[in-house]
Amino acid sequence: MEQGAEGLSQWPVAPHQFTEDTEKSLSFLDMSSSPGSGGVHTSWNRGPSGIRRVPQCPELERMSLASAQAPRQSACEMGQQFSMSPPEHGLSYCPQMTFTASQMVYSQGMSPSQPGMGAFKGAQAMPLGEPSISSVAVTFSGNLRMPPSGLPVSPPSGIPLMSHIGMPTMPYSGLPTVPFNGDALTPNMFLDPTMPPTEVQAVLPSLAQMLPSRDPQDFAMPPAGSPSLLPLESQGSFLSQPVSQEDFPKHHLCEPRREAQNSRAQERASGRSSPVSRPYHCEYENCGKAYTKRSHLVSHQRKHTGERPYKCTWEACTWSFFRSDELGRHTRIHTRYRPHKCDQCGRQFMRSDHLRQHQRTHMRMPRSPDPQADSGRRAGPLPAPHL
């Protein structure tokens, strides 16, 4: 206590002004909405001149922890927690996100660069009840304004930075005490210290799109080459463990395969449709047939004219044919000449197509060594004798 008193005597601040600043820094405005609105707890420190300079000493930090622990624990049970400075000086908020695929921890350091912006000195990941779920506390800093609806929006675009306030609430331990240093701070992990405020405000809305939605199946992040991740990749990775590829939607590149299949199908179709050269066309009306040989065209034209030059010379036979091969098959009926013989049963046929049709019957039924038994099986069972 004596060392704390000596530390207090070293600061050129009046006692009554120091007490007034301490009480104002520890005052909280609790705003608890209904469960349907997401359970938002808002707290800010108002003062006549914005954020004041508070001496950093161990005794004051213990007092701040003791006095702010009770309201913060009740606020954490309601859901996400926002810590805000006055709207005219800026806004800093800490949304809480939960990832089930892999535990990710955001760690952020601050460096003084520009005035008029709220600041936090680090955020820690708080464990939850389930061992497989990790709570991630993310700290953003920038010039923001608070509309009447309650969502922080960026001044140039008016896009809400937190669009998933209605997430399921989970209790966690209170965040560490946030000491105000008086100087404005900006994050040096997400953005370059020399980056102008307009680029800072342009990057923050893109970070809000990476927050998960209610439905775990809708969890998706922009690809690695997207413009929203370029400033993050330039400063290094901010995740302790990489997210597995199972959490990202699988993109199947089927377009080249489909194009290749279509080209192959077209080639096959063109191969079928490309006929052999048929220079001999039938000139009769509504016919349009073509042939590779002139003899085939002549025999075809005989069907149009009705001419049958090939006549059977067998006695008492009046058959005539368009082609000579047809006449030769017909004469075998009279001579009983059957040149085509089955090698399994010994039957003979006048035409080769009749032999092939007969050989299919042997494939459908078991082979019999006796040709007569085979012929009797084809004829059918014998009738039973009458007793």
From Swiss-Prot:
<keyword id="KW-0238">DNA-binding</keyword>
<dbReference type="Pfam" id="PF00096">
    <property type="entry name" value="zf-C2H2"/>
</dbReference>
<feature type="zinc finger region" description="C2H2-type 3">
    <location>
        <begin position="340"/>
        <end position="362"/>
    </location>
</feature>
<comment type="similarity">
    <text>Belongs to the Sp1 C2H2-type zinc-finger protein family.</text>
</comment>
<dbReference type="GO" id="GO:0003700">
    <property type="term" value="F:DNA-binding transcription factor activity"/>
</dbReference>
<dbReference type="InterPro" id="IPR013087">
    <property type="entry name" value="Znf_C2H2_type"/>
</dbReference>
<feature type="zinc finger region" description="C2H2-type 1">
    <location>
        <begin position="280"/>
        <end position="304"/>
    </location>
</feature>
<keyword id="KW-0862">Zinc</keyword>
<dbReference type="GO" id="GO:0000978">
    <property type="term" value="F:RNA polymerase II cis-regulatory region sequence-specific DNA binding"/>
</dbReference>
<feature type="zinc finger region" description="C2H2-type 2">
    <location>
        <begin position="310"/>
        <end position="334"/>
    </location>
</feature>
<dbReference type="InterPro" id="IPR036236">
    <property type="entry name" value="Znf_C2H2_sf"/>
</dbReference>
<keyword id="KW-0479">Metal-binding</keyword>
<feature type="compositionally biased region" description="Polar residues">
    <location>
        <begin position="30"/>
        <end position="46"/>
    </location>
</feature>
<dbReference type="GO" id="GO:0008270">
    <property type="term" value="F:zinc ion binding"/>
</dbReference>
<keyword id="KW-0677">Repeat</keyword>
<keyword id="KW-0804">Transcription</keyword>
<feature type="region of interest" description="Disordered">
    <location>
        <begin position="213"/>
        <end position="234"/>
    </location>
</feature>
<feature type="compositionally biased region" description="Basic and acidic residues">
    <location>
        <begin position="257"/>
        <end position="270"/>
    </location>
</feature>
<keyword id="KW-0010">Activator</keyword>
<keyword id="KW-0805">Transcription regulation</keyword>
<keyword id="KW-0678">Repressor</keyword>
<protein>
    <recommendedName>
        <fullName>Krueppel-like factor 17</fullName>
    </recommendedName>
</protein>
<dbReference type="GO" id="GO:0006357">
    <property type="term" value="P:regulation of transcription by RNA polymerase II"/>
</dbReference>
<feature type="region of interest" description="Disordered">
    <location>
        <begin position="357"/>
        <end position="387"/>
    </location>
</feature>
<dbReference type="GO" id="GO:0005634">
    <property type="term" value="C:nucleus"/>
</dbReference>
<feature type="region of interest" description="Disordered">
    <location>
        <begin position="28"/>
        <end position="54"/>
    </location>
</feature>
<dbReference type="GO" id="GO:0000981">
    <property type="term" value="F:DNA-binding transcription factor activity, RNA polymerase II-specific"/>
</dbReference>
<dbReference type="GO" id="GO:0000976">
    <property type="term" value="F:transcription cis-regulatory region binding"/>
</dbReference>
<comment type="function">
    <text>Transcription repressor that binds to the promoter of target genes and prevents their expression. Acts as a negative regulator of epithelial-mesenchymal transition and metastasis in breast cancer. Specifically binds the 5'-CACCC-3' sequence in the promoter of ID1, a key metastasis regulator in breast cancer, and repress its expression. May be a germ cell-specific transcription factor that plays important roles in spermatid differentiation and oocyte development.</text>
</comment>
<keyword id="KW-0539">Nucleus</keyword>
<keyword id="KW-0863">Zinc-finger</keyword>
<feature type="region of interest" description="Disordered">
    <location>
        <begin position="257"/>
        <end position="277"/>
    </location>
</feature>
